[in-house]
Amino acid sequence: MEAPAQLLFLLLLWLPDTTGEIVMTQSPATLSVSPGERATLSCRASQSVSSNLAWYQQKPGQAPRLLIYGASTRATGIPARFSGSGSGTEFTLTISSLQSEDFAVYYCQQYNNWP
């Protein structure tokens, strides 16, 4: 049995708007999983962002890679094991069967309100 590896992702990501900050809170901060297992990452907005939510993956020394936009639409070339769901204030990124290349940092970003 393979030793668990860690998925790390940002606890907090926020973008300000003209009426106040929208705070994006991700949980859990770390997730210990093994290849082949399912990983579920959550993101909560402090106010509704409709479906204007994106998920990114970042590996050391690389730029962030867009995985999901519109809360549930996979970007071009993203494998079907990645799926997004949710709307309003509650969102989820699911990786159905983790591959070794999936161990990375994951971010959610709202784009409903911009500075």
Swiss-Prot record:
It holds the Pfam family V-set. The keyword Disulfide bond applies. Its main location: secreted. Residues 44-54 are annotated as: Complementarity-determining-1. Residues 21-43 are annotated as: Framework-1. SMART domains: IG, IGv. Disulfide bonds join 43-108. It is found in: Secreted; Cell membrane. Residues 1-20 form the signal peptide. Residues 55-69 are annotated as: Framework-2. One of its GO terms (molecular function) is antigen binding. Keywords: Adaptive immunity, Cell membrane, Disulfide bond, Immunity, Immunoglobulin, Immunoglobulin domain, Membrane, Secreted, Signal. GO terms for biological process: adaptive immune response; immune response. The keyword Disulfide bond applies. Residues 109-115 are annotated as: Complementarity-determining-3. Coiled coil: none annotated. It comes from the Eukaryota. Residues 77-108 are annotated as: Framework-3. Residues 70-76 are annotated as: Complementarity-determining-2. SUPFAM superfamilies: Immunoglobulin (SSF48726). Residues 21-115 form the Ig-like domain. Immunoglobulins are composed of two identical heavy chains and two identical light chains; disulfide-linked. V region of the variable domain of immunoglobulin light chains that participates in the antigen recognition. Immunoglobulins, also known as antibodies, are membrane-bound or secreted glycoproteins produced by B lymphocytes. In the recognition phase of humoral immunity, the membrane-bound immunoglobulins serve as receptors which, upon binding of a specific antigen, trigger the clonal expansion and differentiation of B lymphocytes into immunoglobulins-secreting plasma cells. This is Immunoglobulin kappa variable 3-15. It comes from Homo sapiens (Human).
